[in-house]
Structure formats: C-alpha cells, structure tokens
Amino acid sequence: MLVPKRVKYRRVHRGHMRGEAKGGRTVAFGDYGLQSLENNWITNRQIEAARIAITRYMKRGGKVWIKIFPQKSYTSKGVGVRMGNGKGAPEGWVAPTKRGTIMFEVGGVSEAVAKEALRLAMHKLPVKAKIVSKAEASKEVNA
C-alpha cells in the first residue's frame, strides 16, 4: 500500500478542493490514461484496489503507472469520544485529486485491453472519470 516514508507533520488541515488541476493533466508515460472528472480524496486502499484491477486484467502484459500519491493524512476520533480535547489520531492517507488529473496510465497493450482495464479501475474509485488517449489529453491541455 502507498504511504509516505516520513512526513514533517502528522496532522494536516483539510484544505479546499476548488477548480481544476494545474499539473498532471497529460498522459506522459503510457498510451492511455484515466482522467478524473471530479474533485475528491482518493485513499491509498482505493488506489491499490484500482491497481490490482488493472494488473489482473492485463495479465502481466504492458505496464501501469500510478500518477497520484497519498501524501495527506486524515484523522478521526474514536467512537464515543466527546468533542474537544484536540484533533483525532491519524486514520489513513489520501491523495487529493482535482478535476483533470490523470490518475493511472497504461501502455504496452492493445487499445481494447487498455480501455477495459481502466474501465474496471474506474469502478474502484470514488470519482467520475474518463479514459483518454495520449493525443486526446494533450489536445485538452493545449485548448
């Protein structure tokens, strides 16, 4: 599972998820990518589930690139704990993903296999997404 090796601060502010992604909008490594259409947090477990779905469908063929990393911790208080007394303990890790971000890329397989693998991964994620080719993604950024 993806987790940071070390962080400067264990607890971070929630922050805002407004607007579109500034970077990471092009398919850089593979031939096809999975592009987010919504702003949301994606947990390390969801990323891992999507990765497994892609690799199992491709059956050792091709290559997968994960373009998002869960670097932000989220906290929660225990059940039955009263309000106050500080922020809760770190619960897990999330990757804040904005609209337009390429989350996964695949290469080295046919178009049909790549699209089906990414479609399966889409169902594991909490955001609406679309499958884009290298040419489509670069056209959108330049427009």
From Swiss-Prot:
UniProt keywords (A-Z) are: Ribonucleoprotein, Ribosomal protein, RNA-binding, rRNA-binding, tRNA-binding
Q: What does this protein do?
A: Binds 23S rRNA and is also seen to make contacts with the A and possibly P site tRNAs.
Key word Disulfide bond present: no
Tell me the domain of life: Bacteria
Provide the Gene Ontology terms for cellular component: cytosolic large ribosomal subunit
One Pfam family it belongs to: Ribosomal_L16
- According to its UniProt record, which protein family does this protein belong to? Belongs to the universal ribosomal protein uL16 family.
PANTHER family reported in the protein's UniProt record: 50S/60S RIBOSOMAL PROTEIN L16, LARGE RIBOSOMAL SUBUNIT PROTEIN UL16M
- In its UniProt entry, the species of origin is given as Oenococcus oeni (strain ATCC BAA-331 / PSU-1)
Its protein name is Large ribosomal subunit protein uL16
Q: Its Gene Ontology biological processes?
A: translation
Q: Name one GO molecular function term.
A: tRNA binding
Which PROSITE patterns does the entry link to?
A: RIBOSOMAL_L16_1, RIBOSOMAL_L16_2
Known partners and oligomeric status: Part of the 50S ribosomal subunit.
Asked whether the UniProt record includes RNA-binding among its keywords, one would answer yes
Matches recorded under HAMAP family: Ribosomal_uL16
Q: Which Gene3D superfamilies match?
A: Ribosomal protein L10e/L16
